[in-house]
């Protein structure tokens, strides 16, 4: 008996150690490194796949949305998330943020990391966490390095900017617990009326777009981030937002081969990890009526996997977008089934998770989807997880946040890129840089909301915002008042434009210099232009703010510098614009860059990465040197006017 006890004790200890080891990944911090699957990772993927039930395999296909926010353990949102992971055997998360109208309710990175770690611990298998970090983590979180929109990178003409952007974004994302970026955007923005791509694209030239795409992939891979080329086979030549309706690419196959597809081929050559398929119809590739690329076997399997020989992960765009859901109103679950049958591996953000999961599972059980086809995709997903090291450790190390996120040198890099992007298209009034002058009256800080009669009107700044609840214009105002404390800053949006027009017109009539900063950026799922409106741009100003800008130009066109803090094409709607500069983005670094350029503190060296029909061709841009050091800044008191 004693001998038996001596034999049993080591065996029990070994068994206990083995059981403990199986769960160690839930308690270990994942150290980001090269994306590579080793023998142990391959063995884990094979073993895990063999043990999985059909229900678990189907669950691995789905990526569900999680908003980065603090959640109490008893919060219904947390309980639903936790239960969904278990009930549907979810394979991936798509990190986003809560939205209140036009306002993104962003959280700091530590809140996001803590929530993602809790979800990782709650999941039987490690989760891949994806995000739309098109402008880096700052697109979804506060306190991170800010980068401008992709088109700003195109305006710099320097692919090395995209590479360093990829590296910094990856370092910050991995520190937070995000492994997979739905970027770079490989769309060629060849249609100025495109309502959803616009400044999200690097430009209109297929080669330039491809070069920037490849550079971003290289940088992101250096810091261990999975990348995604989107929106296959091209969303740049559409005139409809696929979040709102059915978009169509009308070009023939020859045009697709020379314009839309080259950046995706370049991405594949660069080793992109995933390709995201768009909810767009392309008659030249699939002539079936209302057949979107997402559910087209000819496009996903025939073109992407076979003709272009892409071996990585194929992921859908969000399945809750109207461009897809309107085609499956009677049976929303079929959208997921048809997407998977077409060749997609990962199905993200279904409009109805339960219906989508059950529909795919039923299709597997009935034989409509073969077990072999299911295993192919699940194996790719498991191998992707192992290539990240998630089989060994799955938690983000909170200690890395203060090391990797918002490093001063990285913040400076984001600002430098925004500076280099500023593009001067017109300067007929010779207003750049602003000439020095001395403001009359008493210098010093004025009270906010002063009446017009009390304020100094030598420099008037009109911020034409899409919604005053957003941060648009705040950094621009701070930077201008730091240089010209007596400037009058007036905020206007669609709801206030009509009432503010008399006051704005009175101010600009008396002003020596006027800056009109126009904030218009492509925003998913929001109709920007009112039906029947007179403006022809799809990413355009609201008619009321457009009318106000027209009034400003009627009274002070030669003295007004119009800043495009987003869509560069909007100048088409206002032929009276005499002075025009593009920042290509509404983020804080672009606001700072625009002010620095106006005051001559930085050279203006950007060149248009797109053609503005009837205005300027791609590659054009007026260059300006730094202002002479002998010039003096504008001085005086401050005034801030809001409705």
Go through the PLM ranges and name each one.
Residues 84-106, 192-193, 268-291, 316, ...:
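Short acidic, glycine-rich surface-loop motifs adjacent to enzyme active sites
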Residues 50-53, 80, 103-123, 127, ...:
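Second-shell residues forming the walls of enzyme active-site clefts
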Residues 67-71, 99-102, 134-138, 186-190, ...:
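Solvent-exposed loop/turn segments at secondary-structure junctions
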Residues 1-8:
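Bacterial N-terminal signal peptides that target proteins for export
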Residues 12-20:
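Hydrophobic h-region of N-terminal signal peptides that target proteins for export
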Residues 22-83, 297, 306, 327-643:
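Preference for extracellular/luminal or secreted protein segments
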Residues 60-65, 91-96, 126-131, 135-137, ...:
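Structural recognition of the beta-strand scaffold that forms the well-ordered cores
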Residues 40, 48, 54-129, 133-136, ...:
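Short, well-ordered alpha-helical
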